Amino acid sequence: GVVMYTTSSITATLGFPKDMWIGRSFIDFLHPKDANTFASQITNGLAIPKIVNDTQEKAQIFGTQGSTMVCRIRRYRGLSSGFGVKDTSVSYMPFLLKFRFRNISDDKGLVVYLVIQTVPFFSAYKTPNEILTQEVSFIMRHSANGNLEYIDPDCVPYLGYIPQDITNRNALVLYHPGDLPFLQEVYQAIVKEGSVTRSKSYRMVTQNGHFIKVETEWSAFINPWSRKLEFVNGKYYIIEGPANPDVFESPDPEKTPKLTEERKNQAQICRDDIIRIMNEVLTNPAEIAKQQMSKRCQELALFMEILQEEQPKAEEEFHLQTQDVDHTYYERDSVMLGGISPHHEYNDIKSSAETSLS
């Protein structure tokens, strides 16, 4: 889609002259990694049908609530970087995009426009190793094989990651290698008990390569049919910020801690053990689900047995009641409504009809 209008805040935020975007494609200003995600979300919204009065009509795109996503938008290359030198390198800034389609009438008739509101993200930390005084949390979910399935967009200013960059990657890589033995015990408790109350603090890596400290409340979903763990949910409470407070800064290999090959191998062994635990350990929730399923089957079998025993008696009683009811209502109808009865003579029928009409 071609940009038709921008607000003046684009200059203060990204450095572009106000009208520089006019007539150009919005996707051209997005980070290459985010362009496909943006286009896919818009396309999916356009493809959603709406059923009204049993007929399929064109959907009101994204409903009344609109839709959101996180992506990076390019900064203006002409921004001055000091001493009259202009930075010609391409840089991007993360934003939360809120967008919806609107139908607008103009000289060409009814035209559909995409309206996008952008909210910039800034690092939530001001100082190195900042201790957070207010409670801040985000949600993350991964499958039994460790693949990250969902991460809360609220985590962006605290971790620095764009959600689509780390989705479908190994979530266990986010944990500090030195804390993996402790987390291995935590995961054993998760799969055995189904949940774990708020854990003690451990470290999680941010986008810039430094670590924050978090405490987590864990819960697991056990499939009642397969009795296997499907996924693990975690609510992560941030306790302490990273040594480098700018989580959006590119990682510096010289400043980030390096691991020896031995430490890397030990960390990978721990991750493999955690995945094995999630897929092999027999869990208490699974046993409970198995017992509940067995109990329900027994109750259903008992109910069907009782129902079959009572069916002949019930049919006999129903037959007798039906005969009495039919006879009673048959006589009552002929008297109250003046209905035609084969037991009455024609004169009686005429008299009854005249009486009911008067």
From Swiss-Prot:
<dbReference type="GO" id="GO:0001222">
    <property type="term" value="F:transcription corepressor binding"/>
</dbReference>
<dbReference type="InterPro" id="IPR035965">
    <property type="entry name" value="PAS-like_dom_sf"/>
</dbReference>
<keyword id="KW-0597">Phosphoprotein</keyword>
<feature type="domain" description="PAS 2">
    <location>
        <begin position="138"/>
        <end position="240"/>
    </location>
</feature>
<dbReference type="InterPro" id="IPR050760">
    <property type="entry name" value="Period_circadian_regulator"/>
</dbReference>
<dbReference type="InterPro" id="IPR000014">
    <property type="entry name" value="PAS"/>
</dbReference>
<protein>
    <recommendedName>
        <fullName>Period circadian protein</fullName>
    </recommendedName>
</protein>
<dbReference type="GO" id="GO:0005634">
    <property type="term" value="C:nucleus"/>
</dbReference>
<keyword id="KW-0539">Nucleus</keyword>
<comment type="subunit">
    <text>Forms a heterodimer with timeless (TIM); the complex then translocates into the nucleus.</text>
</comment>
<dbReference type="GO" id="GO:0000122">
    <property type="term" value="P:negative regulation of transcription by RNA polymerase II"/>
</dbReference>
<dbReference type="GO" id="GO:0005737">
    <property type="term" value="C:cytoplasm"/>
</dbReference>
<dbReference type="GO" id="GO:0032922">
    <property type="term" value="P:circadian regulation of gene expression"/>
</dbReference>
<dbReference type="GO" id="GO:0043153">
    <property type="term" value="P:entrainment of circadian clock by photoperiod"/>
</dbReference>
<dbReference type="Pfam" id="PF14598">
    <property type="entry name" value="PAS_11"/>
</dbReference>
<keyword id="KW-0677">Repeat</keyword>
<keyword id="KW-0090">Biological rhythms</keyword>
<dbReference type="GO" id="GO:0000976">
    <property type="term" value="F:transcription cis-regulatory region binding"/>
</dbReference>
<comment type="function">
    <text>Involved in the generation of biological rhythms. The biological cycle depends on the rhythmic formation and nuclear localization of the tim-per complex. Light induces the degradation of tim, which promotes elimination of per. Nuclear activity of the heterodimer coordinatively regulates per and tim transcription negative feedback loop. Behaves as a negative element in circadian transcriptional loop. Does not appear to bind DNA, suggesting indirect transcriptional inhibition.</text>
</comment>
<feature type="domain" description="PAS 1">
    <location>
        <begin position="1"/>
        <end position="120"/>
    </location>
</feature>
